[in-house]
Amino acid sequence: MPITVFDTKGIPATRRERIEAAVVAAGRQLTAPHEAWIAADPFRGGFKVLITGPHGFERTVTFALDDEAAVIADRVWQTLEE
C-alpha cells in the first residue's frame, strides 16, 4: 500500500472510512511509499489531505465534506502526478 493514512482528525465517523479508502485507492499505482494525514477544515466546511513522500514531496489538497469518493481519489491522484 503506497499511501498510508496516519491520522484522521475531526471527520465524522460516517465519512471517515470512505475518505480514507479514496485516498489510499488514489495511490495504488505509486512505486514509492507516501504518507497522508486527513483533518477537518472548519473554516471552509470541508477537510484537507496532507500528502508527503520521498525527496521532500509535500502537497495539501482541500475538499468539501460531501465530495464523492471518486472525486477525492481523482484529485489526490492528480496531485501525486505533479
Regions found by a protein language model. Give the residues of each.
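A short, exposed loop/beta-hairpin motif centered on an aromatic-Gly-Thr core
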Residues: 58-65
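Short beta-strand micro-motifs enriched in acidic
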Residues: 39-43
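Amphipathic beta-strand/beta-sheet edge segments enriched in Tyr/Trp
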Residues: 44-56
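Residue-level signal for the start and early helices of compact helical domains
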Residues: 38, 52-54, 68
